[in-house]
């Protein structure tokens, strides 16, 4: 007897709910209250309580959605229908429902169906003890599960329907078939052709084809971003003068004419009294305001395809060129599995012929792969660890293909995945780095070359390893030295190489280091849980250096630098200022955090807490107090080394803090001042050490981070070009760092904390070839900075604002800015050799036509406009993947 079936066509997709999900205007909550009705399956007219809960929150709690439907042997008669209808009555008791165990069954379905609007609005949460009565498949149930009622249709219909939503593991079938057929010498071309065709239908390979997954631009966030500048008010230049300069500059540089600046740089000190960032819209650039979305990172437990199987298949000889091509293209375009290609040096090496032959389409698909990895870096932020799929070791980072980078059209490079509209980027008038050249875009060095360059950087000899024998268990090298060493070639090398377009020699590279890194420290990050272990490691480094240099320990000097960060709760501060408990106006403190009187007031509070803790610290240290390195623990921090931070304690609140006494043999280096049970002030001391010697080219700066994972600190570094480290064996790099080394462009910068001027840091790395993309408001401060800070103005050899066009956009290798020893010699240590530069370096810069001509020359069979397809659209959105290009590329080269 037939039954009434639900019409599957009525199940409309809600495109606003996906892996990339629009943030709901309502606050989703998982209800934990007792059931309102005796019937656990009943829904009132309001619908499901889960309908406004974000998908990612539901996914954290539930793995499946279950369908409650009729058994296939259900007899459609009036009596049975009346019994089934009990599931839709609010007063039905559980015993009435569970008595139908022989008529009703539970079917496990993919969680993916929660994205269907009708199911989302009709799903209920039911306890396991009730569901077990209908669990005829004996699946393992959680204590509570999501259930949707389809009591008008039978089990077989439901199972046929959900086949469309199950991730058909055709790739695993393909892999196993190829391995089996290769072993036994079986060749079934028809089967292979059908399998390749079916691979393209796997959901895991189609994520970027969905337009709703691609609306993830950061135009608004980029446009409203503000620099954290404390020193700008001290630059002593009238706003009218800087505005006059900006007006003059717009008249000089035509590219700025389409961008109207706001009336003046915002006064962060007056209008932003709460300590929050100003997010006002100051740009007239027009673009569509897209929805804010959520990007879900890939869970390793959801990976249905084994990485080793893919590797074995691609490095074997059992695939035809066509099969290998399509498999590589599908994996690159997959959000879930792109790292199987890019982050695997064995695979990259084995498919080098495919990459070379089909490079234009590989370029296009790699953009989606790199976007997937970069977004995961941004989502995890300081929670990144070495084993994350988007973290590259140097062996893998040195293998991916290199593509030309043209700042005039950056989206043609797959490593540039900044989802900002081209109008807002305005790279021709931004803080771009050195002009790029095809012959100087050579990727990243391998580990052998890295170690030689590191030796050269530290000691002046690529053969002398002064860290040989060091204990690397709890330390890494990071920071500016990585930007000098990791890129295989830097266009600035052309100023120092004798042979045109030849690889730079170690002697020439040493000259390059002297020019751009003479004052650079070698940053050593340590993750010791105990401060005593940290200090012992500093002494160990000092001993190792002396031993490897063959000098006395006394010739290696160690200086300590003690700093104090004072985190202040803004709400309590405002309250205490209003009540008169603190003798300063709240706004006055906000505007004058660096003033001596303000620092002195809070420093006095620190002294009181420090005195109390030192009574205990001295007892714990005992005789170690006679060692200057340990005495630093109880020494008071000088007022000049104090940084006051208001409303920023949350910035570090999610970090594992190794400074607590329990982690430091009872020693206290962090103190709290509380108001009842609420923290009013946190005083956090930090000690770092400078190790220096006349025998060293650069001094070491050794500091301690607050977490076991190095990326908890390094992942938060200001600029992408320094988000990498060396652990004595290999380097680890984040995607944003690799992009910086491939393009000499920093796609973002992160919140600057402390006393360092962010513009000084941005300009320092620009001098080394790396540009940083700023918005209009930030550019105004940068231009102001250049013309106010004397040494910076001298470095550009600027006389007046008439030469302002020299400061923005990509700079020629021969630009005066890149000759600091010539124009600001006072910034260099005495004893360095006199500056000398190659007069006319033989270097060809990339222009608008360079990339097009390159591909036309190397791939004449491709259509003229084929290489204009990019991952990022001009509006900043991701362009949905055009899968037909994969077929077109193959056909064009093989027919």
From Swiss-Prot:
Protein name: Uncharacterized protein R338
Composition-biased stretches (Low complexity): 268-283
Organism the protein comes from: Acanthamoeba polyphaga mimivirus
Chain segments carrying region Disordered: 257-283
């Amino acid at each position: 007897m037939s039954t009434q079936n639900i019409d599957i066509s009525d199940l409309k997709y809600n495109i606003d709910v996906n892996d990339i999900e629009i943030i709901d205007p309502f606050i989703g909550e998982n209800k934990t209250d007792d059931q309102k009705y005796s019937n656990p399956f009943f829904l009132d007219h309001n619908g499901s309580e889960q309908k406004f809960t974000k998908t990612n929150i539901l996914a954290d709690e539930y793995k499946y959605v279950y369908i409650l439907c009729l058994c296939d042997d259900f007899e459609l008669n009036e009596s049975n229908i009346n019994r089934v209808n009990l599931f839709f009555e609010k007063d039905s008791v559980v015993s009435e429902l569970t008595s139908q165990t022989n008529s009703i069954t539970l079917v496990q379905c993919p969680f993916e169906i929660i994205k269907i609007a009708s199911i989302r609005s009709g799903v209920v949460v039911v306890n396991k003890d009730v569901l077990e009565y209908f669990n005829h498949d004996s699946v393992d149930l959680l204590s509570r599960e999501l259930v949707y009622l389809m009591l008008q249709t039978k089990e077989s219909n439901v199972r046929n329907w959900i086949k469309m939503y199950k991730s058909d593991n055709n790739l695993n079938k393909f892999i196993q078939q190829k391995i089996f057929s290769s072993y036994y010498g079986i060749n079934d071309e028809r089967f292979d052709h059908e399998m390749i065709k079916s691979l393209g239908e796997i959901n895991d390979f189609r994520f970027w084809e969905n337009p709703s997954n691609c609306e993830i631009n950061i135009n608004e966030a980029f446009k409203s971003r503000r620099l954290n500048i404390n020193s700008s008010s001290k630059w002593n230049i009238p706003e009218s003068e800087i505005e006059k300069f900006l007006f003059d500059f717009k008249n000089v540089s035509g590219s700025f004419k389409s961008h109207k600046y706001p009336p003046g740089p915002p006064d962060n000190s007056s209008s932003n009294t709460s300590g929050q960032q100003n997010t006002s819209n100051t740009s007239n650039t027009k673009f569509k305001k897209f929805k804010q979305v959520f990007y879900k990172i890939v869970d390793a437990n959801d990976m249905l395809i084994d990485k080793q199987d893919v590797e074995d298949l691609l490095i074997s000889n059992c695939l035809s060129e066509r099969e290998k091509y399509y498999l590589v293209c599908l994996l690159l375009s997959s959000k879930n599995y792109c790292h199987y290609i890019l982050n695997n040096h064995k695979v990259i090496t084995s498919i080098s012929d495919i990459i070379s032959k089909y490079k234009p389409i590989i370029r296009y698909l790699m953009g989606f792969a790199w976007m997937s990895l970069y977004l995961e870096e941004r989502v995890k932020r300081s929670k990144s660890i070495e084993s994350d799929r988007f973290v590259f070791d140097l062996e893998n980072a040195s293998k991916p293909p290199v593509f030309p980078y043209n700042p005039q059209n950056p989206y043609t490079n797959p490593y540039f995945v900044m989802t900002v509209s081209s109008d807002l980027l305005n790279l021709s008038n931004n803080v771009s780095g050195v002009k790029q050249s095809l012959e100087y875009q050579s990727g990243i060095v391998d580990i052998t070359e890295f170690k030689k360059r590191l030796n050269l950087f530290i000691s002046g000899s690529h053969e002398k390893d002064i860290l040989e024998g060091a204990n690397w268990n709890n330390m890494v090298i990071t920071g500016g030295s990585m930007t000098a060493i990791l890129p295989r070639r830097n266009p600035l090398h052309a100023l120092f190489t004798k042979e045109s377009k030849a690889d730079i020699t170690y002697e020439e590279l040493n000259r390059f280091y002297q020019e751009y890194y003479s004052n650079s420290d070698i940053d050593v990050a340590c993750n010791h849980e105990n401060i005593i272990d940290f200090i012992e490691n500093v002494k160990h480094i000092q001993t190792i250096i002396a031993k490897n240099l063959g000098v006395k320990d006394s010739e290696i000097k160690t200086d300590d630098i003690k700093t104090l960060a004072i985190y202040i709760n803004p709400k309590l501060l405002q309250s205490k200022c209003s009540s008169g408990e603190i003798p300063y106006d709240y706004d006055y403190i906000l505007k004058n955090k660096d003033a001596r009187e303000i620092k002195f007031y809070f420093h006095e509070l620190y002294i009181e807490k420090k005195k109390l803790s030192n009574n205990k610290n001295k007892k714990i240290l005992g005789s170690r107090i006679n060692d200057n390195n340990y005495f630093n623990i109880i020494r008071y921090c000088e007022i000049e080394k104090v940084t006051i931070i208001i409303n920023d304690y949350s910035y570090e609140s999610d970090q594992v803090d190794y400074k607590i006494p329990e982690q430091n043999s009872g020693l206290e280096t962090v103190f709290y001042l509380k108001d009842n049970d609420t923290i009013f002030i946190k005083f956090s001391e930090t000690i770092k050490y400078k190790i220096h010697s006349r025998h060293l080219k650069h001094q070491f700066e050794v500091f301690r981070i607050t977490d076991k994972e190095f990326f908890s600190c390094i992942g938060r570094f200001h600029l992408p070009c320094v988000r990498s480290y060396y652990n004595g064996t290999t380097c680890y790099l984040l995607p944003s760092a690799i992009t910086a080394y491939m393009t000499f462009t920093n796609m973002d910068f992160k919140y600057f904390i402390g006393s360092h001027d962010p513009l000084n840091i941005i300009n320092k790395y620009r001098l080394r070839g790396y540009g940083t993309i700023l918005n209009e408001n930030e550019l105004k401060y940068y231009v102001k900075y250049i013309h106010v800070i004397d040494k910076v103005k001298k470095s550009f050899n600027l006389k007046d604002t008439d030469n302002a066009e020299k400061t923005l956009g990509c700079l020629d290798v021969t630009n005066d800015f890149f000759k600091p020893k010539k124009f600001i010699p006072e910034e260099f240590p005495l004893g360095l050799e006199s500056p000398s530069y190659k007069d006319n370096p033989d270097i060809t810069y990339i222009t608008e036509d360079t990339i097009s001509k390159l591909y036309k020359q190397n791939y004449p069979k491709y259509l003229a406009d084929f290489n204009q397809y990019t991952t990022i659209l001009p509006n900043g959105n991701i362009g949905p993947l055009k899968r037909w290009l994969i077929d077109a590329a193959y056909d064009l080269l093989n027919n």
